[in-house]
Swiss-Prot record:
Gene symbol of the encoding locus: proS
Catalytic activity: tRNA(Pro) + L-proline + ATP = L-prolyl-tRNA(Pro) + AMP + diphosphate
Biological process, per Gene Ontology: prolyl-tRNA aminoacylation
Enzyme class label: ligase
Location(s), subcellular: Cytoplasm
Cellular component terms per the entry's GO annotation: cytosol
Location, primary (coarse class): cytoplasm
Protein name per its UniProtKB record: Proline--tRNA ligase
Originating species: Prochlorococcus marinus (strain MIT 9313)
Amino acid sequence: MRVSRLMLVTLRDIPADAEIASHQLLLRGGYIRRVTSGIYAYLPLMWRVLRKITSIVQEEMDATGALETLLPQLQPAELWRRSGRWQGYTAGEGLMFHLEDRQGRELGLGPTHEEVITSLAGDLLRSYRQLPVTLYQIQSKFRDEIRPRFGLMRGREFIMKDAYSFHSCEADLAMTYRAMDEAYQRIFSRCGLETVAVEADSGAIGGASSQEFMVTADAGEDLILISGDGHYAANQEKAVSHPPKAIPLPASKVALLDTPEQGTIETLCTAQGLVPSQVVKVLVMLARFEDGELQPVLVSIRGDQQLNEVKLINALSRELNKGVLDVAPISADQITAQKLEAWPFGAIGPDLDDALLSGATSWTKHFLRLADPTATELNCFVCGANQNNQHRTGMTWSKLGGVPKSVDLRKSQAGDRCIHDSSQILEERRGIEVGHIFQLGRKYSEALEACFTNDQGTQEPFWMGCYGIGISRLAQAAVEQHHDEAGMKWPLAIAPFEVIIVVANIQDEVQQKLAEQLYSELQAADIEALLDDRTERAGVKFKDADLIGIPWRVVVGRDAAKGQVELIQRSSRKVQILSAKQAFTALVKDIAANQNTRV
């Protein structure tokens, strides 16, 4: 390919809406172009990258025995209603684009395909003899993101590989889950990425257990916590740990404390000579359920700890056996809208009276009370007195009428001691999620009544797994992990081209002839070469070559008359002066050795 025919348009200035390096470089390098918020065109260079990633993914999926297919992007609402996910994905801040056809039938643009694939499996897989089966597809998905950002990292249209497996028993599902784990690690390694596999929350997909694959990068949206010995890693949403030990509050009689303008843990502790671990703080949350119920929740947690809202959502879902759309703090304006008397915010205790909800217009008229073990394990503590500007000291749970249901709700932090070995300390890293695998169990097969006949002749629901990789996100994550101040540094296996030949002066006949000769030889050797034959100044070509990040650069310049060229490796910036023949030999050897083909 010749640059003059590539439609390469590079930018010198950083686009105003690009916040992170990878987004900036992909725009500046002419790889992508914004069409509208969260939607991008993949230009020729980017499409070559995406095709290479896709090829690696297909090879590794095929090697597991998975079968490639293609499912419809438009999905009927009826299937999603049967699984119980339509309301959660479309109401309020739901992420599914949805529409009505000419007959008034509701449809959704697929952000994921559990419902469709489960319905198909129920029709096609009738006997245990047909199992296990894994189907996968690579296609565009859609999410109506509230705040699209970071280019392809959080867009509204993106390319994804999603696979779904069907099994006759849980043990067989576990085997495929492990096989997918290994396949994913090979995929990311072949793509030249450093990744960490971490325990993860299953989120809206659901299921018994899941694991994310994170590309480590400073700009990562996710916080991951890793033990020093490497034996534990988890997304912060899922992480568990030992909290710091509390400093005991000396036992004393219950007494009221006047606490004006002490409505936060910090101001309370400063004024009263306390430390945060001696205080039980109470968070008043509103849970919104898929069935429309609005449930006020009192969460008690030690004063030095933070609430993990994902853990709270999961706890509520387990406690009430129904889906939770979201949780959020209750505000004074919401209380007014419910026609309730004002609550003593900043001084609320675990025993806040249910009577405060008696006149609520749309909320459940009692509090659901939960407490984190950091709070329930305190023998004596300070808490709100349920009166403005009043707290109580010397409190115990028995004096409050009993301990609320205890469940892990705290947010693990760097510096916490590890569960598996209390001598190990959690360390913090940032990560970009590029893959996620789930053991779904029977959540979808039961909801959609997708069954097979087992070896006893009776019907039972499939055991299922699902396995996703963000193809377009992976491409940008590679740039985030491999770049410098001058531009991208693509790993060889997914680079749009393997070599770029830069002719310093295209008007020089000797330079042009040597470049054309080397270009032809590289093509004949099945090396993907890009020839910069533009009439631009040499400096412009060199800057563009650095920016677009081709792994190897050959500069044909003033030494062309002597048959010599410069060979430059993009990743290391190492420069060698070689004859054209030596450069050709070195390129063939290195590229053959580093292709990252499947073994």
